[in-house]
Amino acid sequence: MTSIIARMSNSRRQNTSLPPWAHSMLRSLERSLGPLMAILAERNLKLFSGRVVPAQGEETFENWLIQVNEVLPDWNMSEEEKLRRLIKTLRGPAREVMLLLQAANPNLSVADFLHAMKLVFGESESSVTAHSKFFNTLQAQGEKASLYVIRLEVQLQNAIQAGIIAQKDANQSRLHQFLLGAELNGDLRFRLKNLLRMYANEQERLPSFLELIRMIREEEDWDDIFIKQKRAKRSESVVARATRPVAFGGSPPIVIDNKDCNVIEIDDTPDDSDEDVILVGESQDLPRSFSDSPPSRRRARPQDQVLIIDSPNNSQFPSPCTSGGSGYKNDGPGNMRRTRKRKHTIRCSYCGEEGHSKETCDNESNKAQMFENLIITLQELAHTEERSREAPVEPSDPCELQ
């Protein structure tokens, strides 16, 4: 029956003229006998294990591939069903490698499956090529270690068939090259190195291909769990920071208090001018602490005493409530304050001009101008002393700038 259907199919392909009833009968026979023919073809396929010496009932790779190419055109079924039937014809290492390849690539097609079989179990390459490919197979960027070890196994089998690596040294060669070419975490790398060192003379106790795959997959599962937990904690911290009330920066004003005066110093901002404005008043007018209640902003009133300090860095003119220099200076109990440096104009005491000091003055030849300036200064001092004698003496506020 099979031969009759085959002859009729060949005649149809050759465009041989057939009566209509023959075409109708042929279509009916194909629909009814097609599944039966596929089952018969599958049963006729020989087994393949990938071993160097095939066992009884097994075929070499070349004979197995020829049979597969013959029956594939008669399999009218999905790609998944074809793969399932092909894998059923495999045994031993060939079945293990192809199952792992299918697990790593769920959308594996029949063409890709046969291509992988040719790479692993096909004709041996030259010894130089096989040696170079195996020892230069490295993990690609972004590739999982479990997929890398499958690619490495393909090159290892090629090297074994080329006679470069002995079958008994397969586990040691696989593990050694895997440690060289894979990106692993510290724990797994330490375990594999320890195994390689412990069983250097007992290679049969080293992990096989399947055992190595299992160890790698377990480590990858742990890494995935750790990454998920880390991402969850990070998202929680981001949410916590987002819901936390925002504390605006800026240091509070500094209160300087003694028995005579109170001073509030406010830190500079980028928009401040070059002058410091300090409000000076009686003790009862200023708050003792800023921790009890927030201070209210107030402007300088006409009755307030306002001190404008142009250059507070001149430490040679100290005052009871202010001090020069930079940083913090203690002028007495309760009188700690922070001062700031200001730019000031340099005036020469030799010639009276601005822009340079006495040490760099080059106007020594102008003696007449120097003596004239000195006489004017002495006259001003004499007039000031006479006015101070005529005016009544009044007690001065220690906070006022003389």
Curated annotation (Swiss-Prot):
Disordered as annotated region, ranges: 268-342, 383-402
Biased composition (Basic and acidic residues): 383-392
GO molecular function terms attached to this record: nucleic acid binding; zinc ion binding
Alphabetical UniProt keywords: Metal-binding, Transcription, Transcription regulation, Zinc, Zinc-finger
Residue spans, zinc finger CCHC-type: 346-363
Composition skew (Polar residues), residue ranges: 311-323
Biased composition (Acidic residues): 268-277
Listed InterPro entries: PNMA (IPR026523), PNMA_C (IPR048270), Znf_CCHC_sf (IPR036875)
GO cellular component, one term: nucleus
Taxonomy, superkingdom: Eukaryota
Subunit structure as annotated in this protein's UniProt entry: Interacts with SMAD1 and CREB-binding protein (CBP). Forms a protein-DNA complex through its association with SMAD1.
Family: Belongs to the ZCCHC12 family.
Reported function: Transcriptional coactivator in the bone morphogenetic protein (BMP)-signaling pathway. It positively modulates BMP signaling by interacting with SMAD1 and associating with CBP in the transcription complex. It contributes to the BMP-induced enhancement of cholinergic-neuron-specific gene expression.
Protein name per its UniProtKB record: Zinc finger CCHC domain-containing protein 12
Gene: ZCCHC12
